[in-house]
């Protein structure tokens, strides 16, 4: 579903069409989608009074960088459109609002460049199963339990404190086909379009999935038949020879021996085997354990991962009516907050590690509460 504004220069209202979903890429969707419904919103005299005497700030934002995560990388991909820049936080602060929870952020370490970007520095998050080796920028394995799919925020902190701008997944084609997924509705046309036939490709062997097509186009994927060839391409992509081929080959061989013998103590290999005890993961999420260097499972694949910005979990301190509070605890006259900027009821009700669908309910609830409170204040 999409919105196509037809409001023109009228700043007192909005007329729009609700567009039917299509499976075309976002850049051409509006040109081909069919209108399913239309609506108009017009500002009444009472609404214009609200603009003059009371303002509600419903916004999402990304701002700040927590000291506990180490220095912010010079190069980051953007997981949100350009307009989601956090500037409204500073605007509210300049009006007297108190910001809290500025160290509460959620970013992802598994970002890759979108080969068909919709906004600047558009990044896509890889949702990986547990089998790939996760390496730092020097080609060394991350410590336990920083495995794919385990503790994304822990990886962000580890890489930041170590001064690494990027990291790597090391896997092979068989693991890529079985375990990789992409975050976002645009990257999952089978789910977005409710296409059961396309969805079945995720479970059927020998099928080319949308993820594999994406991987062929994305410049952050490199492939080779041997570790030495792969390292040469990894260093070329990174722009500097930071990874030693002999050291990485020893790492891969040690991992493969543990898988082959079935007697090793490698925590990641053990965790992968445990994940396959759940039938759904065994069918569509976790590849059967095998050697990374198995020629039948090749070629080898390395993915250069960059930091992907996503969420500021703190925000403006509010009371239970959604009124924004100043440093002295008193409401800022006429200023209300709703949505992510309110932290869903006080600037950070979800703590440090809330994400994904847990945001929607808080946005709806805080919007309802602050809207009612503002209406009551105007009616008084």
Task: Label each PLM-derived region with a short phrase.
Residues 3-30:
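A conserved short coil-to-beta-strand element within the FAD-binding core of flavoproteins
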Residues 7, 47, 51-56, 137, ...:
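Short, well-ordered coil/turn residues at beta-beta hairpins
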Residues 21-24, 130-145, 314-327:
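Active-site and channel-lining beta-strand-loop segments
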Residues 37-39, 44-116, 156, 356, ...:
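Glycine-rich loop(s) and the adjacent beta-strand/alpha-helix scaffold that form part
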Residues 89-91, 98-243, 247:
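An anion/pyrophosphate-binding glycine-rich loop and adjacent beta-alpha core
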Residues 127-129, 310-312, 356:
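Short, small/polar residue-rich loop motifs at catalytic or cofactor-binding pockets
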Residues 243-345, 349:
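A glycine-rich dinucleotide-binding beta-alpha-beta segment and adjacent secondary-structure elements
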Residues 326, 330-378:
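Catalytic phosphate/nucleotide-handling subdomain of diverse soluble enzymes
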């Amino acid at each position: 579903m999409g919105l196509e504004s037809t409001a023109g220069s009228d700043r007192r209202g909005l007329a729009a069409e609700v567009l039917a979903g299509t499976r075309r890429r976002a850049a051409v969707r509006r040109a081909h989608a069919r209108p399913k419904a239309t609506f108009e919103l017009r500002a009444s005299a009472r609404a214009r009074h609200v603009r003059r005497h009371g303002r509600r700030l419903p916004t999402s934002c990304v701002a700040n960088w927590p000291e506990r995560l180490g220095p912010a990388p010079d190069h980051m991909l953007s997981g949100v459109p350009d307009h989601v820049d956090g500037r409204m936080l500073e605007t509210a602060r300049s009006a007297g609002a108190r910001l809290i929870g500025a160290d509460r952020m959620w970013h992802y370490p598994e970002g890759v460049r979108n080969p068909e970007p919709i906004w600047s520095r558009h990044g896509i998050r890889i949702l990986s199963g547990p089998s790939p080796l996760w390496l730092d920028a020097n080609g060394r394995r991350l410590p336990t339990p920083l495995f794919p799919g385990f503790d994304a925020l822990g990886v962000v902190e580890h890489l930041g404190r170590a001064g690494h701008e990027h990291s790597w997944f090391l896997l092979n084609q068989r693991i890529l086909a079985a375990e990789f997924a992409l975050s976002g509705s645009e990257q999952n046309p089978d789910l977005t379009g409710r296409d059961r036939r396309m969805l079945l490709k995720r479970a059927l062997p020998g099928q080319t999935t949308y993820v594999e097509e994406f991987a062929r186009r994305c410049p952050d994927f490199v492939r080779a038949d041997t570790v030495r060839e792969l390292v040469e391409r990894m260093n070329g992509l990174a722009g500097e020879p930071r990874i030693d081929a002999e050291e990485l080959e020893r790492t891969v061989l040690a991992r493969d021996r543990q898988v082959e013998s079935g007697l090793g103590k490698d925590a990641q290999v053990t965790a992968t085997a445990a994940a396959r005890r759940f039938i759904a993961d065994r069918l569509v999420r976790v590849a059967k354990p095998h050697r990374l260097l198995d020629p039948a499972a090749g070629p080898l694949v390395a993915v250069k991962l960059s930091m992907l910005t996503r969420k500021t979990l703190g925000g403006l301190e509010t009371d239970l009516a959604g009124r924004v509070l100043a440093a002295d605890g008193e409401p800022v006259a006429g200023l209300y907050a709703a949505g992510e900027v309110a932290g869903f009821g006080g600037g950070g009700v979800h703590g440090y590690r809330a994400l994904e669908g847990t945001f929607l309910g808080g946005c709806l609830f805080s919007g309802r509460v602050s809207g009612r409170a503002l209406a009551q204040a105007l009616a008084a």
